Amino acid sequence: MTSSPLAVEPPTRRAVVFIAGGGTGGHLMPALAIAEELRRKRPDLEPVLLGAQRGLEATLLPQRTFRYHLLPLEPIYRRQWWKNFRWPLIALNVRRELIRLFETEQPVAVIGTGGYASGPCVWFAARRGIPTAIQEQNAFPGIATRQLSRMVRHVYLGLPEARARLKLGRETQVFDTGNPIIP
């Protein structure tokens, strides 16, 4: 059977790259800068942002042109530590949502930029063998970066002195790249 010359090819789906981070502008703005650059340099890839329902991203992402998903996350409380007793339930809900997102979106890579949305997303991807990376903006890496630096493939540092505070995996590669910014 031959196809009609008027037959339209179905649109090809671009490969998805999750960029997870937020909570504050210090984590969200680098995520947006990476997404912009990825869109510009790799039109074959679609950056999809992952953040928290309670973070700054809940306000800023609807104003952007990127697809995004907001997860039912809360920060790890340091001063009001008793609020952390909710974390088992939060973790269960986030895990369910990540299973759904990873099955429907099928990301080819996950990049974390820190903040409480970054940790679960990068960890989930690394456990499934999906290529992972972290971009750390600070000289003193945050909790997510310090914990995940053992299991990710690449760590991109905004400041080279952060390297001394990381415990890296045997195959983790570290790059001093500076911090991504939105012009």
Each language-model region and where it sits:
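Positively charged, low-complexity intrinsically disordered leader regions
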Residues: 2-11
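Conserved nucleotide-sugar phosphate-binding/catalytic loop shared by glycosyltransferases and other
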Residues: 14-24, 44-93, 97, 172-180
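Residue-level detector of alpha-helix initiation sites
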Residues: 23-25, 115-117, 139-140
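Short amphipathic alpha-helix
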Residues: 27-38
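Glycosyltransferases and closely related glycan-assembly transferases
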Residues: 97-110, 118-133, 146-151
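Active-site-proximal region of nucleotide-activated glycan assembly enzymes
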Residues: 126-183
